[in-house]
Regions:
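Intrinsically disordered or low-complexity boundary/linker segments at protein termini
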Residues: 1-34, 106-110, 136-148, 152, ...
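Structural beta-alpha unit
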Residues: 5-17, 60, 86, 97-138, ...
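Small/aliphatic-rich secondary-structure junction motif
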Residues: 10-78, 184-250, 270, 298, ...
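A short acidic, glycine-rich active-site loop
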Residues: 73-90
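Short beta-strands and strand-loop turn motifs
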Residues: 139-142, 170, 215-218, 274-277
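Charged helix-capping and loop-helix junction motifs
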Residues: 153-156, 230-234, 287-292
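Active-site phosphate/pyrophosphate- and oxyanion-stabilizing loops and adjacent acidic/basic residues
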Residues: 158, 201-204, 236, 262, ...
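Short, small-residue-enriched loops and turns at beta-alpha junctions
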Residues: 177, 222-226, 281-282
Length: 312
């Protein structure tokens, strides 16, 4: 069979960890509460707990001058670090009270949650917690596409995208979490290789997908061969493996992808975009950013980023 010679989807099982909570990194902005909303809805539907995590950068992290050159004395540095710590704990207490009020009003589902405040660089603290506890998912809020470059949590989100070992849910400011958890119209970017099987198994095992409309999308490279045959093969695999969803295919030209993709998402009223993402070193991230990274800065749509671990 010609198509089987092009690509084979064997449906082999992927390894997974037993996960018991949803991790929500926050910076106390307005969209932190939106992220908490989405996280609590997801946790409720999947019988999980929520961990709300904030990290603050003390003076020991913020000093960037060469050794021997100090702006503050040790006493002042400790005072400033203590002040930042106190502010972080007070802000977390305010957020915790607001969440409890939302639960009491019935706005947030009543799920068990904890709050954690840690000293350190945000993306490092998130990675350390995630690697230690292996949450089911990381949920992060962010600004709209025109403001992400100006925003701390936006840049942190971009860093976590490229380093996370567990799925991420990214909720832009202005998105209604009720349209994301659960969701009906989904677009999934496909690499058209075996990693797609891994992506789909993880996604369909962790998200409500019954009666979903799924668009399988791919960027057609100039030197890429058998693209139509490969996406047809994967669409048939999906229809057989997930008969409770409907699937359609869409190919994009690499030169016009971002603009055309944005139009396509609006046309299909897509509420959630699923993107596989392979871990990259800093050189690759700077000079050859991933599709997930590009789309993150270009769209205002909720995203699920799923790490893939198969070799290139």
């Amino acid at each position: 069979n010609a198509i089987n010679n092009v690509i084979s989807f064997d449906g082999s099982e992927t390894k997974g960890n037993k996960c018991s909570n949803v991790l929500v990194p926050v910076d106390f902005s307005n969209y932190s509460l939106i992220a908490c909303d989405a996280a609590f809805r997801y946790a409720f539907r999947h019988n999980l707990n929520v961990c709300i995590l904030h990290s603050y950068i003390s003076e020991s992290y913020s000093e960037t001058l060469p050794p021997g050159i100090k702006i503050f004395s040790e006493r002042i540095r400790k005072e400033k670090s203590t002040e930042k710590k106190d502010i972080a704990y007070k802000q977390m207490a305010v957020l915790e009270n607001e969440i409890r009020e939302q639960i009491a009003k019935g706005v947030f589902p009543d799920v068990k949650f904890e709050v954690v405040v840690e000293e350190g660089i945000p993306e490092d603290v998130i990675a350390e917690y995630s690697n230690k506890n292996m949450p089911a998912i990381i949920v992060m809020g962010t600004r709209g596409k025109h403001q992400k470059d100006e925003d701390l949590i936006g840049s942190v989100t971009a860093e976590v995208i490229d380093s996370a070992e567990v799925p991420m849910m990214i909720i832009p400011n202005g998105i209604n979490p009720t349209e994301v958890v659960p969701v009906k119209n989904i677009a999934v970017y496909c690499n058209l290789d075996q990693s797609d099987v891994e992506t789909f198994k993880m996604f369909f095992s962790r998200f409500d997908t019954v009666d979903c409309n799924v668009s399988l999308v791919h960027i057609k490279g100039k030197r890429e061969k058998f693209v139509i045959e490969r996406i047809d093969a994967f669409c048939r695999y999906c229809n057989a493996e997930y008969p409770y969803c409907t699937f359609e295919e869409r190919l994009f030209d690499e030169n016009t992808f971002l603009d055309e993709f944005d139009k396509y998402l609006k046309e299909k009223e897509t509420k959630l975009l699923v993107l596989p993402n392979k871990k990259r070193n800093i050189f690759m991230r700077l000079f050859n950013p991933s599709i997930a990274h590009k789309v993150f800065f270009h769209t205002d749509i909720a995203m699920i980023v799923i790490p893939t671990h198969l070799n290139e």
